[in-house]
Design a protein with these regions (language model features):
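A well-structured
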Residues: 1-163, 490-499
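C-terminal, non-catalytic "cap/extension" segments appended to globular domains
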Residues: 2-3, 22-25, 32, 38, ...
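Divalent metal-coordination and catalytic microenvironments
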Residues: 10, 148, 265, 298, ...
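All-alpha helical catalytic cores of prenyl diphosphate-utilizing isoprenoid enzymes
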Residues: 174, 178, 205-209, 215, ...
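Post-HExxH zinc-binding segment in Zn-dependent metallohydrolases
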Residues: 287-328
Length: 499
């Protein structure tokens, strides 16, 4: 085999893997959006066949031989090809350590789990979900021991979502956040609370859908390649490549802001994915490099931009056009309403100040279940206890408590810290962006092009070419510093609440 032939085979291999990913991703997307309730077993059967073929292709002798050959000639490969080989070898080595029957069974389990989670949340009965969730945790622990027996299993999964991340780093990061957020929240509680009554009323889903379309276009999303559907828990997924991006939302007719910021959040994910350089499509370099960087983009658009005074001033006339009952209010009142800081039950609805406390609850619970210090059966009670301790709220039922997120049903254990990290990454990226982009002026006029161009140049275009830490440091021109985020919160909410 010549090197040129091997490189062609490398590209063909990745295209095949992307095709399997496309098919399996469509099954997941369908199950979470429009599939009839009784079709989970049918999708699970298809998923088991596809995942087995995907496993065989990934770990097959021909694939292994190809990558060993390319690895032996890596000095003759360009930067992108070297990174492709590195990531594929990493995936293969991990997958080879997991027995195929267990891998296939797990993929089938996740299809079942999504269906069971929906039913459990709908009825607010954790006991329905408990047996499946127990299997998911057990499987994640077992797979971590297979892949990295020398590592703590929770460190392994944290690192899978954010390369190199450890519990020690998370503990230090969260301690820094708590040091600033807890006293800030205490000061806010001592002030007269903001009025957010204008956000509550009756806002027809049809009008909210028009708002979603308007927001997506304003953000600069290409609607020929980005689609929007409804689901129980909003998410974003790429299908096959960054040329097909699907985002989802959930409309609450009593609160338009819920979907508004969900669409902006998921739109941030979609901008990142679709911003990958086109020559990365159908390769392992396509799309976001880590969930922390991904969440830096989603929460950047949702909060740093979407909840800014500049953007709310721009978007408010459109809101009044769609929802005439808002016309008796001002853009400043809207800005203050959407930035009301108050402990609450639902993570996705949380304000910027309390949001990280929601993440910390999930981090502590995952860590303890993984380490055998907490039984899955006891998750609801411990969830409720920590919400009372961290946020001072009483959880009324499982639907508004332990069942609110879809992550565990999807096997995403170790994902949650990425949300808090992403928020902090985003604040530092915004500070850097302001050196060359008049962000407020862009937002006042609804012109996202300069903002998107900066993100594309410094973050999006690279896909998975660089490690997340290196990508972030290159974009920032300095080391990551979480106090940039806490300073942002203190300044913003200090002004809003006259602290």
């Amino acid at each position: 085999m010549t090197l040129d032939e091997a490189i062609k085979s490398l590209m063909a291999l990745q295209a095949k893997l992307a095709a399997y990913g496309h098919a399996m991703g469509l099954l997941f997307y369908d199950g979470a959006t429009t599939a009839p309730k009784g079709t989970a077993a049918n999708r699970g059967q298809t998923m088991s066949i596809l995942s087995e073929e995907h496993y065989k292709l990934t770990t097959g002798e021909e694939t292994v031989a190809l990558l060993e050959f390319l690895d032996a000639h890596k000095s003759e490969l360009d930067e992108k090809q070297q990174r492709m080989v590195f990531l594929l070898i990493k995936d293969i080595r991990n997958m080879q350590k997991i027995p195929m029957d267990e891998y296939v069974a797990y993929q089938q389990l996740l299809v079942e789990a999504d269906d069971v989670w929906h039913r459990a949340k709908e009825t607010s009965v954790f006991a329905l979900f408990e047996p499946v969730l127990e299997k998911i945790f057990e499987t994640n622990i077992r797979f971590a021991h297979y892949c990295a027996p020398e590592k703590d299993p929770y460190d392994y999964w944290l690192s899978e979502y954010e390369d190199g991340l450890t519990m020690a780093q998370c503990d230090e990061f969260f301690a820094t956040l708590r040091e600033h957020i807890v006293p800030l929240l205490k000061k806010i509680k001592a002030q007269p609370q903001l009025d957010d009554a204008m956000l509550h009323g009756h806002f027809p889903e049809e009008k909210q859908a028009q708002l979603s379309d308007y927001l997506m276009r304003t953000m600069g999303l290409d609607l020929d390649h980005v689609g929007l559907s409804t689901t129980e828990h909003p998410f974003t997924t790429s299908l096959g490549s960054h040329f097909d991006e699907r985002i989802t939302t959930h409309y609450l007719e009593e609160n338009f802001a819920s979907s508004m910021f969900s669409v902006i959040h998921e739109g941030g994910h979609a901008l990142y994915d679709t911003g990958s350089a086109d020559d990365l499509a159908y390769t392992v370099l396509d799309g976001g490099v880590s969930m922390g960087i991904h969440e830096s983009q989603s929460r950047f658009y949702e909060n740093l931009l979407g909840r800014s005074r500049a953007f709310t001033g721009f978007v408010f006339p459109k809101l009044c056009e769609l929802f005439p009952e808002l016309s008796g209010h001002t853009a400043e009142e809207f800005y203050r309403a959407i930035n009301k800081a108050e402990p609450s039950l639902i993570r996705t609805e949380a304000d910027e100040v309390t949001y990280s406390l929601h993440v910390m609850v999930r981090y502590e619970l995952e860590k303890r279940v993984i380490h055998g210090e907490l039984k899955v059966h006891d998750l609801p009670g411990e969830w409720n206890r920590l919400y009372k301790e961290y946020l001072g709220v009483d959880v009324p039922d499982d639907k508004h408590g332990v069942l609110q997120d879809s992550h565990w049903s999807g096997g995403s254990i170790g994902y949650f810290p990425s949300y808090a990290l992403g928020s902090a990454y985003g604040a530092q990226l915004l500070r850097k962006m302001r050196e060359t982009v008049d962000v407020d002026e862009c937002l006042k006029t609804g012109n996202f092009a300069p903002i998107n161009a900066w993100n594309r140049e410094h973050v999006w275009q690279y896909g998975c070419l660089k490690k997340p830490g290196a990508l972030l440091e290159q974009a920032l021109g300095e080391k990551f510093d979480p106090t940039v985020y806490t300073q942002y919160l203190e300044e913003k909410y200090g002004e809003i609440y006259n602290l």
